[in-house]
């Protein structure tokens, strides 16, 4: 039997997923006000535990979540029929979401910039 190798971050997140009642994550997206169907993923599998979490830390967590998904240890879904709004409050308060909003605001009205509307897609991580 092949033994899975997990990074320290993957181990930490996997443990947290197993003990959590719900494990909310988000996907930061940029949408276009000019082309309604046009969207771009700014940052995938965003897991924030503190509003001040750095981009570097969030990217490390994102990579760990993707690694756990690819190894078949978790399932990630952004197609939620219902969610608990308070689970996602920290994401709205985060410095990274503020940065996404400022980036989109700067693009508004500039020629050639299509992605001018920040969005957040709610997701959940489920243990397998």
Task: Name each region found by the language model.
Residues 1-56:
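Short, amphipathic alpha-helical interface elements at domain boundaries
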Residues 3, 47-58, 98-111:
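Short, Lys/Arg-enriched charge-dense amphipathic segments
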Residues 22-40, 76-100:
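Internal, charge-rich low-complexity segments
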Residues 51-83, 92:
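Short amphipathic alpha-helical interaction segments
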Residues 82-128:
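Short, amphipathic alpha-helical interaction segments positioned at domain boundaries
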